Amino acid sequence: SEPDSDEAWAKVRHDIANELRVWVDKAAAGIDFDPANLKLTSVKASGTSALLQIGHDSQQIVVGRRSLSRMARWFMGSLSASLAEAAEVPVTVVRIAGSEDETVTEAIANALTPGDKPVHYTQPQPVVEEARRPVVVGVDGSETSRRAFDFALEEARLHDAPLHVMFCWQLKDLGVIPGYENAVAPVKVGQRRAEEILSELMAKARIPDGVKVSTNAFHIPASKGLIAASRYASHLVVGSRGLSGLDAHFLGSVSRQIVNFAECTVTVVH
């Protein structure tokens, strides 16, 4: 039952602080970290509102992604997706590997395979080991994506990782292409324009010494392309630009889809 006095609440907070301390000590084992820089806080509030309030002027908010199936994450939403949409600071969502998708995938495979012989689904093994995977940033030439690019550069520098800059484009993302003001540009012309946008971004960038940067433009919807890229990345960084409100829930903004379905850690930059 809920505590009914100030003394009871004080005891609850004390117990929570002890549990947090035990958890942190275990999680930080083997990490070069000064405990003096750590502050433990417990509040009685919904996760989203509490983290937004505590983290409103922080460098970033970091959370783990809840273990729901893909369908449940789309239908019910998640704390991490809500934070990524509402926060004014970068939100990093650490993917915690789980077996829920693998179990459902195996059930689907068995349901659709003729005969009675069971089908066993095995998660494909990554081509590149995690320690060598790049930081990937999705850009589109907008101011928000420029901030995402700057954030990704710093992440790559801190972790001594290569940075891969991706522009996943469709013709509507490219604006008016010279010579095609009243016509639909061919894909090869769009590809050339997308590569020009990437080149313009890189020309203005200040690349830290030692950071290896590569670029690619792909003719594919941003959410689909970046989720595919997440299978080969250690960290995926995107801007928050996209749909909002009812349309975002039913159609899905790029950032919401990536937070819910990416296969690596994701940061959404505002």
Give residue ranges: language-model regions.
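Glycine-rich, Arg-bearing micro-motifs that act as flexible, cationic patches
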Residues: 63-86, 100-107, 235-260
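Structural alpha-helical scaffold elements that stabilize or flank donor/cofactor-binding regions
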Residues: 51-54, 83, 128, 229
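Small/aliphatic-rich secondary-structure junction motif
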Residues: 1-10, 124-183, 235
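Intrinsically disordered or low-complexity boundary/linker segments at protein termini
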Residues: 35, 59-60, 65, 81-147, ...
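Protein-protein interaction modules outside structured cores
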Residues: 179, 188-196, 214, 224-228, ...
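A short helix-to-beta-strand connector/capping loop
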Residues: 29-39, 207-214
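Charged docking surfaces used in two-component/phosphorelay signaling
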Residues: 42-49, 217-224
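Acidic, proline/glycine-rich short linear motifs
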Residues: 1-21, 101-124, 167-196
